[in-house]
Design a protein with these regions (language model features):
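Membrane-interface "cap" regions at the ends of multi-pass membrane proteins
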Residues: 1-40, 45, 51-59, 67, ...
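C-terminal membrane-solvent junction of multi-pass transporters and transport-like membrane proteins
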Residues: 4-5, 327-330, 374-425
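Helix-loop-helix junctions that connect adjacent transmembrane segments
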Residues: 7, 41, 121-126, 154-289, ...
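Hydrophobic transmembrane alpha-helices that form the core helical bundles
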Residues: 56-60, 68-135, 139-143, 296-310, ...
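TM-loop-TM module centered on a large, flexible mid-protein loop between adjacent transmembrane helices
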Residues: 74-75, 81, 235-301, 320-369
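Helix-loop-helix connectors at the membrane interface of multi-pass transporters/channels
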Residues: 77, 104-127, 163, 221-225, ...
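Membrane-helix boundary/coupling elements in multi-pass transport proteins
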Residues: 91-106, 216-218, 279-322, 377-384
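Membrane-interface loop-to-helix entry segments
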Residues: 111, 128-180, 210, 233-238, ...
Length: 500
């Protein structure tokens, strides 16, 4: 019955889903603050060399696991076994913990614009404390089930896209009309300065171009199959890259790059636009603030519940306690959600110790979020490399090019991501205490805990169960496939003439 519901997503539907999953105006603001209009060509390159190939990698894993509703755990287990599948799924969850720290201050800033009409500036410590109370509230709401979350997020996302297109059209018209941009738009300004700081910011760019894993899972549901999927993904990637590039090119038409804030940058650029066209800025601030606040708060509620539910229900039973993974009547693991809340508290408070302003705090939080977000795709790429190296003969409906092409493409991506990860983990100008105790310390503690937790689980298994848990599923599939082929060969071999 389930099979009859497949192949129901049209090309335009997939294009819309891809756009909604990947594009965010806040990503334009974040990267403009560091790179200026030089982020414009970098965005386009990132979508071509990362987003499109990574989508195809995920699509191949989905094709490999087409008989199951595969997730990150299943994809990596198929090529690397259970241990690395758990580590990868775990990194996706703990990246989300850092994501909360960057999202919560934005919710506060946009609430200020929505209700006051301007950004009320708090100290870093006050911002962190308010963020903690806000996260406690969102955890409580998410555990209770948010019925209106889907419709609210859909409406606000549509409004944000409408605002984005409106800004591009109006800012472009202003430039064509002869306005002198606040910051120059020329070849020199668009040329990145290739240094260690730039390599660190590439993590922000790749994070902005992420979202492939949420789109590529639908490769089996697209009308026209894998060929149609590949065409749409390439078109989507180019479209998103162009939109990011054009937005980045026009973001400083009305507002200087140096004046933009990580928290309320979206409102700032629309305030500049409204001032140029003679529109009431206070009303514009409130409108954009309300739309942004609603979208951010909806995103907060969704991400508070969804990742923790997916992670704790996808991994094998026995790694965490039964009470931790038990679902309430709304389908949310309540205890795990509150554990998530208590972990975020020190992640919010520690960076305030070395931050003189909310802008400094946000720089640290976004940088660490971007650095951590490099790990899950990196593990998936390593799994894919192992798949093409050792198990490429496993039958599947879709492959990203030949074996050599797949290995070459993913090897380049692994090299880029490795450099970007280290450059963002050890950024220039950051406090050595922040780097040691937050950037490095946070990763060591979280990954070390995951490794220890899996070792305890593995020791509790029998030798046979441990063998099957750590065995890549692709290896089992290949052995079964070759066994079937050998049996078929025996059946089809002509019988030899026997001596009388």
């Amino acid at each position: 019955m389930a099979a009859s519901n497949r192949n129901t997503i049209g090309k335009f539907g997939l294009l819309s889903m891809t756009f909604a999953a990947v594009f965010s105006f806040n990503n334009v603001i974040n990267n403009n603050i560091h790179l200026g209009v030089a982020s414009s060509p970098v965005f386009l390159v990132a979508t071509i060399i990362y987003f499109i190939p990574f989508c195809l990698i995920i699509a191949e894993f989905v094709s490999l696991n087409r008989n199951s509703e595969a997730g990150v755990y299943a994809w990596v287990k198929s090529a690397l076994g259970g241990r690395w599948a758990f580590i990868t799924a775990y990194t996706y969850w703990f990246v989300n913990l850092f994501f909360f720290t960057a999202l919560l201050p934005r919710v506060i800033a946009y609430a200020s614009y929505a209700f006051l009409g301007y950004d009320y500036v708090f100290t870093p410590l006050t911002t962190a404390i308010i963020s903690i109370f806000l996260f406690a509230f969102s955890t409580y709401i998410s555990n209770s089930g948010a019925k209106l979350l889907g419709p609210m997020t859909s409406v606000t996302s549509s409004l944000m896209l409408l605002l984005t297109f409106s800004y591009i059209v109006l800012a472009g018209a202003a430039v064509l009309g002869g306005i002198e941009p606040a910051d120059p738009i020329n070849v020199q300004a668009m040329t990145p300065n290739f240094n260690w700081a730039f390599l660190g910011i590439t993590a922000w760019i790749f994070q902005a171009a992420g979202g492939a894993e949420s789109v590529a899972v639908y490769v089996n549901d697209v009308k026209g199959g894998s060929r149609a999927f590949v065409k749409v993904i390439i078109v989507s990637g180019l479209f998103i890259g162009v939109l990011y590039s054009v937005s980045s090119l026009l973001i400083n038409v009305f507002v200087h790059r140096a004046d933009l804030h990580f928290t309320g940058g979206t409102v700032q650029v629309f305030e500049g636009l409204s001032a140029h066209f003679g529109l009431p800025t206070v009303l514009m601030n409130r409108f954009v603030g309300i739309v942004s606040f609603t979208a951010m708060f909806g995103s907060l509620l969704m991400w508070t519940a969804a990742p923790v539910k997916i992670f704790f229900t996808e991994i094998p039973k026995g790694i965490f306690g039964e009470k931790t993974i038990r679902l309430n009547r709304h389908g949310v693991p309540t205890r795990a959600a509150w554990i998530q809340f208590f972990i975020v508290i020190p992640l919010m408070l520690i960076p305030t110790l070395g931050s003189s302003s909310v802008q400094d705090l946000m720089n640290t939080l976004i940088n660490m979020t971007a650095a951590a977000s490099m790990l899950p795709p990196l593990f998936i790429m390593l799994a894919y490399l192992n798949l093409r190296l050792k198990y490429d003969r496993v039958a599947r409906d879709f492959k990203m090019g030949s074996r050599l092409q797949g290995i070459a493409i993913v090897s380049v991506l692994i090299a880029i991501f490795t450099v970007g990860f280290f450059a963002s983990t050890f950024p220039t100008g950051a406090s050595i205490m922040t780097i040691v105790f937050y950037n490095v310390g946070g990763l060591v503690v979280f990954l070390g805990y995951a490794w220890w937790k899996y070792n305890r689980y593995a020791k509790s298994l029998s030798a046979e169960a441990r063998y099957h848990e750590d065995m890549p599923l692709a290896r089992l599939a290949l052995e079964a496939q070759e066994g079937a082929q050998a049996g078929q060969s025996v059946l089809t071999t002509p019988a030899c003439n026997k001596p009388m």
